Amino acid sequence: MSGHPGSWEMNSVAFEDVAVNFTQEEWALLDPSQKNLYRDVMQETFRNLASIGNKGEDQSIEDQYKNSSRNLRHIISHSGNNPYGCEECGKKPCTCKQCQKTSLSVTRVHRDTVMHTGNGHYGCTICEKVFNIPSSFQIHQRNHTGEKPYECMECGKALGFSRSLNRHKRIHTGEKRYECKQCGKAFSRSSHLRDHERTHTGEKPYECKHCGKAFRYSNCLHYHERTHTGEKPYVCMECGKAFSCLSSLQGHIKAHAGEEPYPCKQCGKAFRYASSLQKHEKTHIAQKPYVCNNCGKGFRCSSSLRDHERTHTGEKPYECQKCGKAFSRASTLWKHKKTHTGEKPYKCKKM
């Protein structure tokens, strides 16, 4: 039988032939994404077989589904946490139908069945990842094709995986089952809770391989790495300017529209970016939290401190590509470039 999904003959396969279970030891080795993929594969396999009315010799699909995990529970009932064979009655979790060989691992029996039947592996031609069963292969392909077969009945949003739809539904129901034991704040996703818990522990597990800087969240590391690679995937459709993160592009688009959605409550001045408003608000309270270690001078924002520190170090990182002259500040380089272009953007209004 070929490795193409279309060649899998569903009516010749019982659920227990394709149901892949794990011992406790094997399950512990899987990461969360692999466990989620496993659940999706088993659910979809069950639905596919049930939809065509496929039955085993003496059992219904439902019975086969229950019995595939019952064997493993039987062992554990005698041996406690021991995921291996039962010492009291000698029963093992599963048996290969082709050669009657028993095994402590359901996955090993599944591989043995594949060997007997000649059902080959299902290889992804895009990323070369290999799968043993077609439903697992089909679900994986959605990562490449962008197929989204699961639609939310509430808002119509489509998602690629059933677990993603289940998570999305909590937005509508307001369900927040994951609660922080430290402060009581609740979240709709376990991953959001884990991220939040780091604000209490101070843990920063994501480290940049280029400079060693550590981050609390993986997406922050991802954005930071672009400062090293120069990658700017977000492009303005109006002027072609590119940005390393989506929020920067969104702020830039507001500049074209003339939108300034962040007003200062103290004086009413409006800004395009929340960060610009935060810097401005410090001018009202005369706060200068960024202090130079060399001379003690204080600054309202970290970028001003960095510019100032170069007066001590003599560093000039901004170089003109035209003549090679270097400057300590980006704004000074920008002004210098106009000497080459002849640009004179400032006109006297009285003329």
Swiss-Prot record:
Disulfide bonds: none
Domain of life of the native organism: Eukaryota
Statement: the UniProt record of this protein carries the keyword Transport: no
A GO cellular component annotation in the UniProt record: nucleus
Compartments reported by the entry: Nucleus
Zinc finger map (C2H2-type): 122-144, 150-172, 178-200, 206-228, 234-256, 262-284, 290-312, 318-340
KRAB domain segment(s): 13-106
UniProt keywords, alphabetically: DNA-binding, Metal-binding, Nucleus, Repeat, Transcription, Transcription regulation, Zinc, Zinc-finger
Residue ranges crossing the lipid bilayer per the database entry: none
UniProt KW Transport keyword: no
GO biological process, one term: regulation of transcription by RNA polymerase II
CDD domains given in the database record: KRAB_A-box
GO function term, MF aspect, one: zinc ion binding
Functional summary from the UniProt entry: May be involved in transcriptional regulation.
Family the entry assigns: Belongs to the krueppel C2H2-type zinc-finger protein family.
Protein name, entry field: Zinc finger protein 124
Phylogenetic classification of the source organism: Eukaryota, Metazoa, Chordata, Craniata, Vertebrata
Gene from which this protein is expressed: ZNF124
